[in-house]
Amino acid sequence: MDNNIQRLIDSAKQSLNSHESHKYIDESFESCIKCTACTAVCPVSRNNPLYPGPKQSGPDGERLRLKSAELYDEALKYCTNCKRCEVACPSDVKIGDLIVRARNNHLAQSKKPLMNKLRDAILSNTDVMGKINTPLAPIVNTITGLKATKFMLEKTLNISKKRTLPKYAFGTFRSWYMKNALQDQQKFERKVAYFHGCYVNYNNPQLGKEFLKVFNAMNIGVMLLEKEKCCGLPLMVNGFPNRARNIAQFNTDYIGKMIDENGIDVISEASSCSLNLRDEYHHILGIDNAKVRPHIHMVTPFLYQLFKEGKTLPLKPLKLRVAYHTACHVDKAGWAPYTLEVLKKIPSLEIIMLPSQCCGIAGTYGFKSENYEISQSIGKNLFDNINEGGFDYVISECQT
């Protein structure tokens, strides 16, 4: 016992003297008043007895982790990074950010099973997988939809066979834009830049086309960044912080170039991408994005501002009853009221705002076999509200 204590003391001294251990320290945890409001709203704590909750994993754990790198906790992997803990925190402690950084450090020091590491790399490297699969989309989509394929993916990579994998588009949004839209966008005097992200580029180009239609209808042209990569969020939460940091710097540089050369704002319709570009690049990865942050916008607050400026859209009545689900990262950023105000512009549309709660999928989290039951349990109340509501459609900014 004495030897173990001495070993921890020696390790703590070495850790405290290391510059690297303090490189991205967020000292906001000292503001924690131990009210446990974060634990009360945590969707994982309510559904997984193995997770101690955001207070213990975040601020409480951080005090220990600063003393010794050995005091990391395997339970950190259960956090979904929904950030509802940060919304609830009266002291503005970046609880989710503390947990993500600690988890990445823990994964770097522990031995993750090889197949799980391969799975996480596949799920996280969305640009790589998109470039490989979009040219072969009809074949890939057919194969990944087979029961035999799902069975093999679960047995080998621990990807749940109960999940439906996203379908790939046959051709990217970016290639469509360059061939069919680029020239037409030059006629508009006012322009915005569009950060389309992975989902639009590889899975749902139609969403990007609709984005263009909306802004063009307001007499605003849409440009693309000269280059862009995945926002890096999947890499950041799955134990690949160095690669995520390189991507974050790449995107920040090209967003900065667009702003410097054209003086226009950068818009994204993806809530997690928007939050990552604006906040997490700095908070979690240590990227200096202070210059570009004021010019990066989520689409609905930006549209709301355009309406205030007097811009209009030729909207036809839509006699539908729709449910609005506040995505986790929308809740964190406070964007939901803007989305609701934009939706209210549509004549005859009845909007029912669902109680704000996590859907459980959390990007790549819910695709993992070990998380499937937990993710379904987290989302159950939301699913029940939707199924019992008799809605024509469900609206959300969350692409997953």
What name fits each language-model region?
Residues 2-10, 14-15, 20-25, 163-180:
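Short N-terminal secondary-structure initiator segments
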Residues 2-20, 44-74, 92-121:
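Non-heme iron-sulfur electron-transfer modules
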Residues 12, 21-22, 59, 68-69, ...:
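General secondary-structure edge motif
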Residues 17-29, 65-77, 216-218, 345-348:
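Short, intrinsically disordered, charge-biased short linear motifs at domain edges
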Residues 20-24, 81, 246-247, 378:
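Short, glycine/acidic-rich beta->alpha junctions
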Residues 26-45, 71-93, 129-130, 202, ...:
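Cysteine-centered iron-sulfur cluster-binding motifs in ferredoxin-type domains/subunits
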Residues 41, 48-50, 176-179:
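Short acidic/polar alpha-helix capping motifs at helix-coil junctions
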Residues 95-400:
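Iron-sulfur cluster-binding electron-transfer modules in prokaryotic oxidoreductases
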